[in-house]
């Protein structure tokens, strides 16, 4: 069995066993363990939340005193009936949606595992990814509190350098990580902005 196949199988089965709808939860878990981006009682915005693995994990981290807003075009495959959770089924590009989410803030952390619909054409997919990242990044800068943290997915081969250089102007530290739970053949990496500057 190829290593990539084994890894995919391992994390998928682990997610099923632990009750998460997708293996992506272990990407955020590793980021959290290394960088502590989400703390108890934080206000957090989750962009591209479906099917809901990150949402479940974040709610466990926050406790009753925290608050989570989440948005996705698709519905969540989980049910969260808690007063400190708000889900908006909508478009993260839409200004009305952004205003609704901003009203629930400001946020101590913005996290995103969002990815555009893919075509199989790496150039097209990378460009779509960049457009999505720029939209999420602009939203994060609007809604984050000073000292806030930002996590997002980026595909290699795009405008990484420009985005990272701009982030250094707005965050005290910028880190890059390809989590172990990412598929072996995936071009994805995660960018972590720590401590938004005032």
Task: Please annotate each region the language model reported.
Residues 67-72:
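Conserved SAM-binding motif I beta-strand of class I
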Residues 130-146:
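A short glycine-rich, Lys/Arg-flanked "PGG" loop and its adjoining helix->strand segment in the class I
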């Amino acid at each position: 069995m190829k290593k990539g196949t084994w890894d995919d199988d391992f994390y998928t089965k682990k997610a099923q066993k632990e009750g998460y709808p997708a293996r992506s939860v272990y990407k955020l878990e590793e980021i959290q363990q290394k960088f502590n981006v989400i703390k108890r009682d934080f206000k957090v915005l989750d962009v591209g939340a479906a099917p809901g693995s990150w949402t479940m994990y974040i709610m466990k981290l926050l406790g009753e005193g925290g608050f989570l807003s989440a948005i996705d075009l698709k519905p969540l495959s989980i049910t969260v009936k808690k007063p400190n959770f708000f889900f908006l089924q909508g478009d993260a590009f839409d200004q009305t949606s952004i205003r609704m989410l901003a009203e629930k803030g400001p946020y101590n952390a913005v996290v995103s595992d969002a990815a555009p619909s893919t075509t199989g054409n790496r150039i097209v997919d990378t460009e779509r990814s960049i457009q999505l990242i720029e939209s999420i990044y602009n939203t994060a800068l609007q809604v984050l509190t000073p000292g806030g943290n930002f996590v997002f997915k980026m595909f290699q081969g795009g405008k990484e350098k420009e985005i990272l250089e701009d982030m250094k102007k707005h965050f005290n530290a910028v880190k890059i990580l390809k989590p172990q739970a990412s598929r072996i053949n995936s071009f994805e990496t995660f960018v972590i902005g720590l401590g938004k500057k005032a």
